[in-house]
Amino acid sequence: MKKLLYVIIAMAAILVSCNDYETYGDKKEKERNAISKFIADSSITVISEDQFNQQGYTTDLTRNEFVKLDKSGVYMQIVRKGCGEGLSDGESTNLVCRFRETDILNDTLQAYNDVSAYAGIPDIMHVSRTGSTYTASFTSGMMYSIYGASVPGGWMVPLTYIKVGRPQSMEEECSKVRLIVPHSQGHSTATSYVKPYYYVITFEREAK
């Protein structure tokens, strides 16, 4: 009788553990729901790539527009196009990046270096362009300290559409974007835990 009871208890424990287990599909669905909720809560207007192209690769800030880029799944808002020039084909350079990172799934501010206390320690990203392909690695900064040298794919998405010059006057400003980055375009933590992240990032060339 006791043996039968032990078997029943063991089977119940297995059933509970199976019910608690999340498949990759479950996690992706949870991610999609979290992104949809974030978009709704933030009153974001999502536009297609076609509309984005027709608008001259701009997003209307008065309507809080984000374009969903089909290839990457990244949602992007261009706050400022920036000054100077974008990266030219065959070019490699260092970009100074200041950012704010939010874990969308848990609605938690994870990391930032966009305040005066961290003004002297931005992230430095070494980036190269070959045709339409960008590759990059962090060489120093907070992202480098937390996640290592690998740059999230989502961070490179805006480089096709912005200028990365360094402001030379009060009238000029560095480029600034807002991104919703799914786990597939995120850093190692995002990929491992199937978590989407929200970023506010500025880019400019490093002073020579």
Residue ranges of model-derived segments:
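Sec-dependent bacterial lipoprotein signal peptides
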Residues: 1-18
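Cross-family detector of peptidyl-prolyl cis-trans isomerase
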Residues: 18-208
